[in-house]
Design a protein with these regions (language model features):
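Beta-rich nucleic-acid/ligand-interaction surfaces
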Residues: 72-92
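Intrinsically disordered, low-complexity regions enriched in serine/threonine
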Residues: 1-25, 29-33, 92-302
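Short linear motifs at secondary-structure transitions and domain/linker junctions
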Residues: 59-64, 83, 96-98
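Residues at beta-strand starts and edge strands
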Residues: 54, 81-83, 101
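N-terminal low-complexity, intrinsically disordered segments
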Residues: 1-78
Length: 302
């Protein structure tokens, strides 16, 4: 196992200046060609994809500008089907003067017409490069009001641009506020997690509870014998990551609930999936995201 220490989106994204235009974002994300997300080739009927992506990036840009959070990175997954962006929040925190955790707003679109925008808030632990979605009271779904309607006459698209009105600006600011509050609360929870000491028995059961809950409930104790005979690949990697993953040598992670949580998020972000693209897709938008949430709940209940 190679225990790499890098951002899970390395190679799948590009850092940007938040002041560039939506058109430039389309170009930088390599979404300016129809075939970039249509592997069978050809041109899809209706409005050109570049318009859809430009208007999606226009929403990203307007949302982050009105919310006061600068865009930092844009990227794509699944051959361009999913387009995402990260905007930096100022609510980053550091545990015991060494374990730095950054905070981001993640915006993304999985809808091929780019009519819908989804968001959530995530942390990024720099030691290890693992992410965790932070539950909040914020809205998670927005209609892309920047999309222009298709017309039957040349130029086949409305020339009227839709801008954020007072209502959507208010909702944007409320969403960002809820996200900031959730990150602040998580920072307090993280402080509690680093003060919860665990032993090997607790650590083994935790990993089984996260990855194989159907087995752990039938075991009175989980030692090396049970790990060797019953643990699947994910569970074994998670147990190994407790001590071997990057960042696990920090004082915050010396057999603490925090170290267990980060072992899981590292495993999901860096060790599962057939390739980096599928790994990040599953970690952010698929079963991996649910595994992380279960890991967070279990860590808080230790």
């Amino acid at each position: 196992m190679d225990w790499i220490n890098e951002k899970p989106w390395n190679g799948l994204s590009v850092d940007i200046n938040p002041n560039i235009s939506p058109h430039e974002m389309v170009y930088k994300a390599k979404l300016d060609l129809e075939t970039s997300w249509n592997p069978t080739g050809g041109v899809r009927p209706g409005r050109p994809k570049s318009y859809a992506n430009q208007e999606m990036f226009q929403f990203f840009k307007s949302f982050t500008e009105h919310g006061g959070v600068p865009l930092e990175t844009i990227g794509t997954l699944d051959n361009g089907r999913i387009v995402w962006a990260l905007a930096t929040l100022k609510e980053e925190f550091t545990l015991m003067k060494a374990d730095n955790v950054k905070a981001y707003l993640l915006l993304y679109s999985r809808n091929k017409n780019r009519d819908n925008i989804e968001i959530y808030f995530t942390t990024f632990r720099q030691a290890g490069g693992n992410t965790l979605q932070i539950p909040s009271k914020a809205r998670t779904f927005f209609k892309n009001i920047c999309r222009r309607p298709f017309t039957k006459q040349f130029p086949f698209i409305s020339l009227e641009f839709h801008k954020f009105d007072e209502s959507i600006i208010r909702k944007t600011k409320e969403t960002i506020t809820h996200g900031r509050e959730a990150i602040i609360d998580f920072a307090k929870n993280a402080e509690c997690l680093i003060n919860k000491k665990v032993n090997n028995q607790i650590a083994n059961r935790y990993m089984f509870d996260v990855f194989q809950p159907e087995i752990s409930k039938n075991l009175s104790s989980i030692g090396n014998k049970e790990v060797n005979e019953l643990a699947d690949k994910k569970t074994k990697i998670g147990i190994e990551a407790i001590t071997k993953a990057p960042g696990q040598n920090l004082e915050t992670s010396c057999m603490t609930a925090w170290s267990l949580l980060n072992a899981v998020t590292y495993t999901v972000d860096h060790c599962l999936g057939s390739d980096q693209d599928s790994r990040l897709r599953l970690a952010w938008f698929g079963p991996g995201a649910k595994i992380k949430q279960r890991a967070l709940e279990l860590a808080q209940n230790l």
